A protein has these predicted regions:
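Alpha-helix boundary/capping residues
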Residues: 4-7, 28, 102, 106
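Mixed-charge interfacial surface used for oligomerization/domain docking
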Residues: 40-43, 47-52, 62-64, 70-229
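N-terminal glycine-rich anion-binding loop in soluble enzyme alpha/beta folds
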Residues: 1-20
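N-terminal glycine-rich phosphate/adenylate-binding segment common to multiple enzyme folds
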Residues: 17-47, 54
Length: 229
């Protein structure tokens, strides 16, 4: 994180190659791949290529690639649901169908301390990033149904914007009883603060806190909070 802050250019990331995915496939089992939003990373396309090559070469295992249309906490949500459904004994096709339906309904909300890495990698307009940095405005962002980033609101401080994020959850009639995953980038205390607000205002059936990792850490950057339900 310190090296990324000090480096003036975009942090370089690379998605797994199709061959790297294929090395993990099981010929005698079900293979589920969950990727970062296809609008943010080449991981989804690489995984789809891996599936195609594997099947063309006569691979016998079942393979499905899930485009989470989210990041970090959203990927965790999808992975948890896959495990729950598979462990319950559902056949491969039904697991895929139910998880794809869940992804269609999943909501992703996030607040970042800085937008620099998103800007440097072309995920935000340069003007938007420079303006928010100059004004010290913190944006409440979300994911569209296609997995693209959109601005939802803003605040003058990160605590104010996090509070607005929780308010948005509380006002969503569909959130009650669902699982919320809170992912944090090097800020566990901030995640706990969000959890406390959620407990006071929302009716989630379950809440989990997880750290970001991999490419999600690059985009969330130090202090970022990414939620999905």
């Amino acid at each position: 994180l310190q090296k990324m802050r000090a480096w003036p250019d975009a942090p370089k990331t690379a998605c797994p190659s199709p061959a790297a995915y294929m090395k993990q496939f099981l010929d005698d089992g079900d293979n589920y791949i969950v990727t970062l939003s296809g609008r943010l990373s080449g991981s989804y396309n690489a995984a789809v290529q891996a599936k195609t090559i594997y099947q063309d070469e006569g691979g016998k295992g079942n393979v499905h690639v899930f485009n989470s249309r989210s990041a970090s906490s959203g990927q965790v949500q999808v992975a948890l649901l896959i495990r729950e459904l598979a462990d319950s004994g559902l056949p491969f096709g039904q697991v895929v169908e139910q998880v794809e339906t869940f992804i269609d309904r999943m909501k992703t909300l996030f607040v970042l301390e800085t937008l620099d890495n998103l800007r440097k990698n072309g995920r935000l307009t340069k003007v938007q990033s420079l303006v928010t940095g100059a004004l010290r405005v913190k944006l409440l962002m979300g994911a569209t149904r296609e997995g693209e980033i959109e601005k939802l609101s803003q605040g003058l401080s990160i605590r104010q914007t996090l509070a607005r994020m929780v308010s948005r959850m509380a006002e969503d009639a569909d959130h009650a009883g669902r699982r919320l995953v809170i992912a944090h980038c090097n800020c566990p205390e901030r995640a706990e603060h969000v959890l406390e607000m959620v407990r006071q205002r929302c009716q989630f059936g379950e809440v989990q806190i997880v750290p970001t990792s991999g490419i999600a850490t690059v985009y969330a950057n130090d202090g970022g909070i990414v939620t999905a339900y």
